[in-house]
Regions:
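Feature activates predominantly on carbohydrate-active enzymes
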Residues: 13-17, 21, 60-246, 250-269, ...
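Substrate-binding cleft/loops of secretory-pathway carbohydrate-active enzymes
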Residues: 301-334, 382-389, 415-422, 580
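Short, well-ordered secondary-structure micro-motifs within conserved domains or adaptor modules
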Residues: 29-56, 159, 163-165
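Acidic, His- and aromatic-enriched active-site or binding-groove loops in soluble protein domains
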Residues: 167-176, 191-198, 267-281, 319-340, ...
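Catalytic domains of carbohydrate-active enzymes that cleave complex glycans
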Residues: 402, 428-664
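Aromatic-lined carbohydrate-recognition surfaces of secreted/lumenal glycan-active proteins
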Residues: 278-313, 369-376, 408-409
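Acidic/histidine-rich, surface-exposed loop or edge segments in extracytoplasmic proteins
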Residues: 1-9, 214-215
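Structured mid-domain segments that build the active-site/substrate or prosthetic-cofactor binding neighborhood
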Residues: 225, 235, 240, 348-454, ...
Length: 664
């Protein structure tokens, strides 16, 4: 916690990164560290305007005998170094050495002819909102810094590295489920529910109960509850969250149920109730800081999210102490549609989200807003989805509506495959919403696939098109096909398959599903053919079984290994994606066939479902992370479709009916 020592650490690391990369370009170069320039010798000087600030703006300033890389703070120096390396041709497309793409060796340094200045308007941060205590990776964090990202969850094993890289660490989240667990024992020996049933929210319908206590937001108007929560918050901040720079303070994830008691209703809507509580927290934390009970400043990140009934802007002014403290809001459109622009008034999903975000921005004065995107929300289960079609437009909308930061759930720790493009685009757009998406994508494909970039462009375009309706297929809430299937008992349906207004009818769903599947299968075929061509390229295969001895040989071997890695990882991910989406389509079609009494067609579809089930059972799709305990989970692919139990119910129905194809 010594800012000047931290600055020296980060700037020293920047110097080492610069030297390491330059030596890979010019192995015979003599590069040394000095404390001052030597007359007549080319030098790259690293300078921070402030040793006590972590400002990430930077400038590359040509000098008579070299270059000055100047940062507003220590992080700006680091980002300036990476900007200079990008000028040389370096790219970091995914974590680890497999994602490092170097320039041709021996080409000499490219010095900027004119001054380069850059700064991001995303001052709240750019990064990932993560799940799971075990989700940490040094390679990922280094990739983030190299791509100018600076927000991640606090994790103990990589905490020092995050400090060095200038990454802002967050903790907390939906914290009150544990703090207000009804069966939590109190010092008196009674459970929290038995001691304080009045603390739990009054539901709109029916009585309170221990079993349903956490399905309604707690009663923020209870005079004894707020002090209890304040002390719990302080205990966590001074305990397990002590190293975090910011704390996510989010309500119960109840999806739409707020306390309806008279005093809570008098506070305003659900958002007003949240802000009332947060204001008390802020006042308490400020007093604790002044009294020495809290030993460091900490920001609160509140949330605008329909799961906590806080999506809509407040009806009353925002408390001044939240504004004064620099606390901010995370805007979380979890069920947004990717087939339409975020601001498309014709989209039943996005219309409400865009209106609410605009409403937050129109409040004066208002809390700064960070947008939380959902490119890998838990319902998507690491499917090979691409969002290039929507990202450029949406980031422009976010900027116009005042967004000052960007994060997304949940970045995969491994197996990026083609999703590396989403991560690269997200990093570039989070820094600069005006970034040239077409140029970035073209460069990405060229560097990742070399001579095969043209083939892979068609693969990426097909996957992108197939991803557009993913919200209608698999989103949270009961409008998606997945939710409809999960609520089905597996028997003969009593009503037609319900689809959202994007599909409109089961017949339109059927047509759209077959088109989506055709796109994925075509992409899969091209991937297989490309990988086969690479494997049969004998010119790239060495037979002398010796280590490469010169830079050209080393580069050739590295490029060949990187290409194989990229294609093989793409293939594995797309096999899983195609299997999953085909299973979903066939399940929806099977439902419709049963409802229509078309038992022969249902039998044919059931055989296909059975085949897909067996295939998905045979391979793993890692990784997921437990949010409840220290667990790392590698589920089979069938489990990750979230249809295992639905298929089991369907099978039971068929067996009970004594249908001859019940066992295939």
């Amino acid at each position: 916690h010594d800012p000047e020592a931290g600055a020296r650490c980060t700037i020293s690391y920047a110097a080492v990164e610069l030297r390491t990369h330059l030596l890979q370009m010019e192995p015979d170069a003599q590069i040394c560290f000095v404390s001052q320039r030597h007359n007549g010798k080319a030098a790259i000087e690293l300078h921070a305007d402030s040793l006590t600030a972590s400002g990430d703006a930077y400038a590359l300033l040509p000098q008579k005998d070299g270059l000055l890389i100047r940062g507003a703070g220590r992080v700006g120096v680091l980002y300036g170094v990476y900007e200079f390396l990008k000028m040389q041709g370096w790219r970091w497309l995914e974590p680890g050495t497999a994602g490092e793409y170097a320039p041709e060796p021996g080409c000499g340094l490219l010095w900027p002819k004119n001054a380069v200045h850059d700064a991001s308007a995303s001052t709240l941060g750019r990064g990932f909102s993560i799940e799971g205590a075990l989700k940490e990776s040094a390679d990922l964090l280094i990739w983030m810094a190299r791509n100018r990202m600076n927000a991640y969850g606090d994790r103990p094993n990589t905490r020092a590295l995050m400090r060095k890289l200038g990454i802002v660490m967050r903790d907390g989240g939906h914290i009150f489920e544990a703090i207000l667990a009804p069966d939590r024992p109190t010092p008196s020996g009674r459970t929290l529910w038995d001691a304080h049933p009045e603390w739990y929210g009054t539901p709109a319908h029916g009585p309170k109960s221990r079993q349903t206590a956490l399905q309604t937001q707690f009663c923020v108007s209870q005079p004894e509850l707020i002090p209890y929560l304040c002390e719990e918050l302080l205990r966590h901040i001074m305990g397990p969250w002590h190293e975090a720079d910011e704390i996510d303070v989010w309500g119960l994830d109840t999806w739409g149920s707020v306390c309806t008691c008279e005093r809570c209703r008098a506070l305003g809507n659900g958002t007003d109730q949240m802000l009332h509580m947060a204001s008390h927290f802020r006042s308490f934390l400020d007093r604790a800081r002044a009294a020495g009970r809290l030993d460091h400043d900490v920001k609160m990140a509140l949330i605008a999210y329909e799961g906590t009934s806080t999506l809509a802007p407040p009806e009353r002014p925002i408390p001044q102490n939240l504004l004064d403290a620099g606390d901010y809001l995370i805007y979380a459109p979890i069920v947004r549609c990717y087939a339409h622009g975020f601001d498309d008034p014709g989209c039943s999903y996005n219309r409400a989200y865009a209106s609410a975000l605009s409403g937050w921005n129109q409040i004066r004065p208002h809390l700064p807003v960070m947008v939380l995107e959902y490119y890998n929300v838990s319902k998507f289960e690491d499917l090979p989805l691409l969002f290039t079609h929507s990202m450029a437009h949406d980031f422009q909308v976010y900027r116009r509506t005042g967004a000052a930061g960007f994060v997304y759930m949940h970045v995969p720790l491994v197996n990026w495959g083609m999703r590396a493009l989403t991560q690269v685009l997200f990093a570039e757009l989070a820094w600069d919403p005006d970034a040239d998406i077409a140029k970035i994508k073209a460069e990405f494909l060229s560097r990742r696939y070399g001579a095969y970039a043209g083939r892979l462009r068609s693969v990426y375009d097909q996957i992108d098109m197939a991803s557009q309706q993913i919200t209608s297929w698999r989103a949270w809430k009961d409008r998606s096909l997945l939710s409809r299937l999960q609520s089905w008992n597996g028997g003969r349906p009593e009503r037609p398959l319900q689809v959202d207004d994007h599909f409109q009818t089961p017949e339109a769903f059927d047509t759209a599903g077959e088109q989506m599947l055709s796109l994925l299968q075509a992409a899969l075929l091209t991937l297989r053919e490309t990988l086969s061509a690479v494997k049969h390229d004998t010119a790239a295969i060495r037979t002398d079984i010796v280590t490469a001895v010169n830079p050209a040989q080393q580069r050739s071997a590295q490029q060949s290994a990187q290409l194989r890695h990229a294609l093989e990882e793409d293939l594995r991910l797309l096999v899983y994606g195609t299997d999953t989406m085909q299973l979903m389509l066939r399940m929806g079609q099977y439902y419709t066939a049963l409802y229509a009494g078309c038992d022969d067609r249902a039998a044919l579809l059931w055989r296909q479902i059975d085949t897909l089930e067996q295939r998905l059972e045979q391979y793993y799709m890692p990784l997921t992370f437990s949010t409840d305990c220290l667990d790392l989970i590698s589920n089979d692919a069938l489990t990750r479709t979230q249809l295992r139990e639905v298929i089991a119910r369907c099978r039971k129905f068929r067996i009970d009916q004594h249908w001859e194809d019940a066992v295939c």
